[in-house]
C-alpha cells in the first residue's frame, strides 16, 4: 500500500473536499472517477474525504465514498480520530450505522484514549452511543449459517440471518416491539424457525461469557431476546391466532392503574434465568429490581434498557406506550395522556386503554386547571412586584427632590449652620459640667 502524506493534495482532490461540503453527489462521483483523485487522500490535518463527509452529516456522500473503496478505519488523523468518531460526533444515526456496517472498529481510541462511543457520550449524542454499543457484525451471525465441524447442516438457516440480525441490533428492547418484529416477518413467525433462532442466541450468549474479553452486556441482551423467542414459541404452540394473543397479554393492564403486570413479570423472569450467576451485570440488575414492588419505579424494563443500551433515563423524550419506540409524538385525542408512534400502535393498545381513558382525561383536565391557576397567580405576583417597585421608585424620587430643594435655599443652610454651632457649644458646656473641678498641678 502506497503511503499517503498529509496535505499533499492534487487540485482535483481539493475540489473533492469542497464538493463534499457544498456540492452534490453527482459532482463528487465525477471527481472520484478521475485518475488524479485518491479516495483516501489526506488533508493537512490527516482527514480523509470520508471523515469530512461523516462529520458534515452527508449520508449519500459517505455511501458513495465507501463504494469507491474508502478506508473506514483510516487512523491518520492528527488526533487519532476515525470516520466512526466523526459520524458519532455529528449525531447522525444513519451515518453511524453505515460506518459500522462497513466494518468500522468500535474499540479504536483517539489521542486522549477515547473510543467513538465515549466521544459521542461526551457531546451528548446518546442515540449514536446506543447504536455503537448495540451493534453486532453480520459476519459473526453468518458463521452459524454454515455447517461447523461434524455438523451436516448449519445451526441457522441462511434465510433467517437477515431478520434475526435486525432484531439483534435493535436498540428498542421492549418485549412488544420484539414480538412485533417477529410477527411482521413470516419467516420468523414459525415455531421451527424460532427454535433455531433462540438456540443460536444461547450459543452467542455463551461465547460472550467464555471469551477472553468477556462481554456481559451483549450476553445479557442475547439471553433476553432468547427468552422472548421462547415465550413466542409457547404461544405459537398453544394458540391458533399466533402472536396477537401474546401482544395483548403483554399490554393488558391491571384494573387499578393499568400497569402491565405480565410484561413486568416476563422481563424479571428473563433476568432471573440468566445462567451466569457470577456476572457483575446480573448482580447489579438484581439489586436494582428486587426491592421494587411490581408497579413502582423503576420498572424492570427501564433498568434493563439502561444497562444494555446505555440510554439515559433523564433525557426529555417521549416513548410509545405500546412498543416503547423512542420519539413517539401522537397522543390519544380524548385523554391527551397516552402517546403512540402511529395509528397501528394505538389500535393495538385500545383494548387496554379504553378502560382507563376517561379517568386519564379527568386527570389531564385537573392538571390543566391547576397549571392555569398557577400561571395566573404567578402573573398576579409579578404585577404586584412591578407595582411595589414603582411605588418605591416614586418615594425615592420625592426624597431626592426634597434634599435638592434644601440645598438650593441658602437661608435655610445658614440657619442650619447656626443651629449646628449652637448645639456644638451646648455640647461643650455639658462636657465641662460633667467633668467638674480639676485638681491643679500646683
Curated annotation (Swiss-Prot):
Keywords tagged on the record: ANK repeat, Cell projection, Cilium, Metal-binding, Repeat, Zinc, Zinc-finger
Chain positions of ANK repeats: 45-74, 79-108, 159-188
Binding site for Zn(2+) 1: 320, 323, 341, 345
Region (Disordered): 401-442
Pfam families reported for this sequence: Ank_2 (PF12796), zf-MYND (PF01753)
GO cellular component, one term: cilium
Protein location: Cell projection, Cilium
Principal location listed in the UniProt entry: other
Subunit and partners: Interacts with the retinal-specific guanylyl cyclase GC1.
Protein name: Ankyrin repeat and MYND domain-containing protein 2
Species name: Bos taurus (Bovine)
Lineage: Eukaryota, Metazoa, Chordata, Craniata, Vertebrata
